[in-house]
A protein has these predicted regions:
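Short Ser/Thr-rich beta->loop micro-motif in glycosyltransferases that lines
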Residues: 202, 258, 276-283, 302-303
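Conserved donor-binding/catalytic core segment of Leloir-type glycosyltransferases
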Residues: 186, 190-209, 215-218, 227-228
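Acidic donor-binding loop of glycosyltransferase active sites
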Residues: 268-284, 294-297
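Glycosyltransferase donor-sugar binding loop
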Residues: 202, 226-241, 259
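Nucleotide-activated donor-binding/catalytic signature segment of Leloir-type glycosyltransferases, i.e.
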Residues: 241-263
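Acidic anion/phosphate-binding donor-loop and adjacent secondary structure
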Residues: 151-152, 168-189, 207
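Donor nucleotide-sugar binding/catalytic pocket of nucleotide-sugar-dependent glycosyltransferases
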Residues: 134-151, 156-175
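Conserved acidic donor-binding segment of nucleotide-sugar-dependent glycosyltransferases
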Residues: 315-324, 332-337
Length: 339
């Protein structure tokens, strides 16, 4: 079933809900780039339902709350662990979620990925996710394309899954030349220009984004271009970080910015680019692609998950293999070379 708002989704479970607990924490300081803030923005502004953003350590709060007040709801996003430290905290999370359900609380679970990006502990993740899928009152996904994938993976009926589109990111459009000059003044490392076409890979630096392959494919090309790789290096991704430095340090066509990009600089980054490349090895939904669309960027991305719905979008080029990715890159370079 497709719905138009979280309010509609929640009302279908309980018309008298007065408190929604959200996990993980909403980053209220990033109202233009934080997915969770944008998803709950209407409810936050309306202020009729209290939105309680909860950390891992504060899970006990929603358990205590539902014990005294049934007009509450738990909206959980993701449910993953990446290392020993986070796996040790998982039993506490699961106990709190289980007790909350036992005491009569309703759960909405938003599925963002069928597998963790780092693909660690896959069988354990699958068992936990199937348990969560059974426990949830409603499972939320961002596209019709995800319904069958989530239903078959977690062995649940499609009727338990609600579709609410990914929130849009507000865009601040700036003339490209202005954006490039300002971006270079902040991150250019002495550069005076960005030669078109400007390819962009942005967000946290991580292996699942296929950055190694993008570098290898572009480095073989002769036409001029610029590749910007911008974002903070995620925990455990030092090997990838070192690879990028080693492969690009002598290539003036690549600008590597391994740093957190402040929200106010995203308009410069997006407006300065021509094409955003997303080389995910596996994906269900992507906030990065939604942001690129907000800035009217051309997009190269895999034919997977929610992205399959973009197959007829003239601004999007979808690929099924490394060869098709290479073809898209060469076609883009040829287009710019020929004016």
């Amino acid at each position: 079933m497709e719905i138009s708002s979280l309010k509609e989704l929640y009302s279908g479970l309980n018309k008298h809900i007065d408190t929604v607990f959200v996990v993980p924490l909403i980053r209220f300081d990033f109202p233009k780039t934080d997915y969770l803030y944008l998803l709950y923005e209407d409810l936050i502004d309306e202020n009729k339902v209290k939105i309680e953003s909860i950390s891992v350590f504060a899970h006990f709060r929603f358990v205590l709350h539902v014990f005294f007040n049934r007009n509450t709801l738990l909206h959980y996003h993701w449910l993953e662990f990446q290392d020993v430290k986070s796996i040790l905290g998982m039993p506490y999370k699961l106990i709190c979620i289980g007790l909350y359900k036992l005491f009569g609380g309703d759960i909405v679970w938003t599925v963002h990925n069928l597998k963790p990006h780092d693909k660690k502990y896959l069988s354990l993740h699958l068992r936990i996710h199937r348990w969560m899928a059974r426990l949830a009152s409603i499972i939320h996904v961002h596209s019709e394309a995800s319904v069958s994938l989530v239903s078959s993976t977690y062995d649940i009926p499609p009727g338990k899954i609600a579709v609410l589109k990914h929130p849009d990111f507000p865009a601040k459009l700036v003339p490209q030349e202005t954006a490039r000059n300002e971006f270079l003044s902040l991150y250019g490392d002495g550069r005076k220009e960005l030669k078109s076409p400007v390819f962009l890979v942005f967000g946290g630096i991580s292996e699942y984004k296929g950055i190694r392959e993008i570098i290898e494919l572009l480095s073989k090309q002769k036409p001029e271009f610029t590749l910007i790789i911008a974002g903070y290096v995620k925990k455990g991704q030092e090997s990838l970080h070192n690879f990028i430095i080693e492969q690009t340090i002598d290539d003036s066509r690549v600008l590597y910015v391994p740093a957190f990009i402040p929200e106010e600089h995203y308009p410069l980054l997006l407006n300065a680019s021509d094409i955003c490349i997303f080389n995910y090895d596996e994906i269900l939904s992507s906030g990065g692609i939604k942001m690129a669309q907000s800035y009217n960027k051309k997009i190269i991305a895999p034919y997977a998950g929610d992205l399959r719905e973009l197959k007829n979008d003239r601004m999007v080029s979808l690929f099924n293999s490394k060869e098709e990715l290479q073809t898209s890159i060469i076609s883009t370079l040829s287009h710019y070379s020929n004016g």
